[in-house]
Amino acid sequence: MKFNYYAFKAIYLHEMDRFKRTLMQSLLSPVLSTSLYFIVFGSVIGGYVENIDGISYGSYIVPGLLMLTLLTQSITNTSFGIFFPKFNGTIYEILAAPISTLEIVLAFVGAGATKTLIVGTVIFITANFFVEVDVTYPFLVIFLLVLVSFTFALFGFLIGLMSSDFEQMSIIPTLIITPMVFLGGSLYSLEMLPQFWQTVTYFNPVVYLINGLRFAFYGVSDFNIWISISSMVAFLLVCVFLVLVLLKKGYNIKA
């Protein structure tokens, strides 16, 4: 079947237009909230904390805070993107249109990842006003940002498909992802923890993402970079499989 570019473009641009209409909430809100972290932890508290692995504390926390934004925004953007058509009934028009399941997923996930990358880029630029950020491997940073954005946009699409109301959609970003980021070494090195808590932290998947991005920024990490990349690719493939299967079966969509 030939790829329906126009149908893909219509959904993608519709999602991007929604991003423009809610610019205050979609862009300014996460940028301002993250800036507060840079001010409090980077500029104020950072002046009283010793360097970690030869990196100033303010600079050290940049990858963790950036990862927090990437995860929450990619999940929220895409989950709401697919849930709204379910909520107002327009999802049936999309399913009835001459567009494949893959094209629907690519359009929503592509738009969600694009919005996340825009927010992430603005936050990265903003971070430079508060702390010194020197990137060691810029191409690896770009690769990881794109990989994380698309992977968790897919995860957000999956959440949107499985959710029956707005409350269910907010549970994972608020009660699961955010605590996992803060407990995953976003504001500290794992070597600062007692041995028991270091072992517990190894079971937190987000810690590998944060360390992967920190390695791309500064060349330091608590884990091998390939562990971070391979775990992310594996999670991406699982999300692709689940989304395509559930959407094709019409899970939580078709009556």
Regions found by a protein language model. Give the residues of each.
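Hydrophobic transmembrane alpha-helices and immediately adjacent juxtamembrane helices
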Residues: 1-138, 143-255
